[in-house]
Design a protein with these regions (language model features):
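Ribosome-associated RNA-binding proteins
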Residues: 2-146
Length: 146
């Protein structure tokens, strides 16, 4: 039984068909946003911030862990200030002038993240605290004795 020939010599490989790819047009500039909403979630272990436009579409986000802080250092006010500093810089790239702040959580970085926005020159319109408070739910964890 002889092998059937496929048309190409045995040592040759067929050249793949190359499709013409149109270059993707990049937007020349980011969208300009005058006012936005800053969500700050501060826990005992970390501080996370989200910057959105007025309708709630996310523009930028950051956290203490994303900036390289590890372990117990993530929950410090210094780490939260750095998170706010990074987001304020990103917000200025979008042309952000004023934010409404929504704070959630009981961590130590609640205020220092917001203060870094003030030092960058971004106006604070309002501060809203939406920390969930139980109506006598489950028993809370015991207080630490240090």
């Amino acid at each position: 039984m002889a092998k059937k020939s496929t048309g190409a010599a045995e040592g040759e490989a067929k050249a793949p068909a190359v499709a013409a790819v149109a270059p993707v047009a990049k937007s020349s500039s980011k969208k300009k946003v005058e006012s936005g909403i800053l969500y700050v979630q501060s826990t005992y272990n970390n501080t996370m911030c989200l910057l959105t436009d007025a309708s709630g579409n996310a523009l930028a986000s950051s956290s203490a862990g994303a900036l390289g802080f590890k372990g117990a250092k993530k929950g410090t006010p210094f780490a939260a200030a750095k998170v706010g500093d990074v987001l304020a810089t990103k917000g200025q790239l979008f042309g952000l002038k004023e934010v409404a702040v929504v704070i959630k959580g009981v961590g130590s970085g609640r205020e220092s993240a917001v203060r870094s926005f003030i030092t960058k020159g971004i106006n604070i319109l309002s501060v809203k605290d939406v920390t969930p408070v139980p109506h006598n739910g489950p028993r809370p964890p015991r207080a630490r004795r240090v």
